[in-house]
Amino acid sequence: MSEVINVNCPTCGKAVVWGEISPFRPFCCKRCQLIDLGEWAAEEKRIPSEGGLSDSDDWSEELK
């Protein structure tokens, strides 16, 4: 018999079974999934970086 793995929904904290029974995992529902997506889209969440971009990084919006 396999062990049931439970995780907490990152949005609301509700327990979620990690398996096919939970189609929105790690979220408990579509609503929590969309709340999280909205936070990423609004840049309320981000992956931390060690440094910023500088002018010498050859990033340009100009067409060549």
Swiss-Prot record:
BP-aspect Gene Ontology terms: regulation of DNA-templated transcription
Co-factor: note: Binds 1 zinc ion.
Keywords per UniProt: Metal-binding, Zinc
Binding site for Zn(2+): 9, 12, 28, 32
Matching Gene3D superfamilies: Erythroid Transcription Factor GATA-1, subunit A (3.30.50.10)
InterPro entries with a match to the protein in the record: DNA_gyrase_inhibitor_YacG, Znf_NHR/GATA
Keyword Cytoplasm assigned: no
A Pfam family reported for this protein in Swiss-Prot or TrEMBL: YacG
A GO molecular-function descriptor: zinc ion binding
Domain of life of the native organism: Bacteria
Needed co-factor(s): Zn(2+)
Function statement: Inhibits all the catalytic activities of DNA gyrase by preventing its interaction with DNA. Acts by binding directly to the C-terminal domain of GyrB, which probably disrupts DNA binding by the gyrase.
Subunit details: Interacts with GyrB.
Family under the similarity heading: Belongs to the DNA gyrase inhibitor YacG family.
Protein name: DNA gyrase inhibitor YacG
